[in-house]
A protein has these predicted regions:
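C-terminal and inter-domain tail/linker signature
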Residues: 1-112
């Protein structure tokens, strides 16, 4: 059984939700590549921090609730429920004040750690 508290994907999402971007330096490679929809892909830890800052500014209650993690060698796959409220515009989505719930899959490939 996987100890969710120890997986990189869980720690990364929790740090992002909390606005603890200093933790990204420990968890992510400086040249991390994150593939994301809506033009939110990043190619460095600094860019990833910037996207999270913008996301939290638009959705202050943004949360990633990890439902399940499967680990296979250097791969961590997570099933995540993302919730929040669009208080301001972000990634082309207007700030409507409406809350949302999205099911998400996150797949990470770990290197050097």
């Amino acid at each position: 059984m996987v100890d969710l508290r120890r997986t990189v994907v869980v720690r990364w999402l929790a740090a992002g939700d909390a606005g603890n971007f200093d933790a990204f330096d420990e968890l992510l490679h400086p040249d991390v590549v994150v593939h994301a929809p809506l033009g939110l892909s990043t190619a460095s830890v600094d860019h990833e921090k910037a996207v999270w800052r913008d996301a939290l500014a638009a959705m202050p209650d943004l949360r990633h609730d990890v439902q399940e993690v499967v680990v296979d060698g250097e791969i961590e796959m997570a099933r995540v429920v993302v919730t929040g409220t669009m208080a301001a515009s972000f990634a082309g989505v207007e700030g409507s004040g409406r809350s949302f719930r999205i099911d998400q899959a996150v797949i990470t490939h770990l290197r050097n750690g």
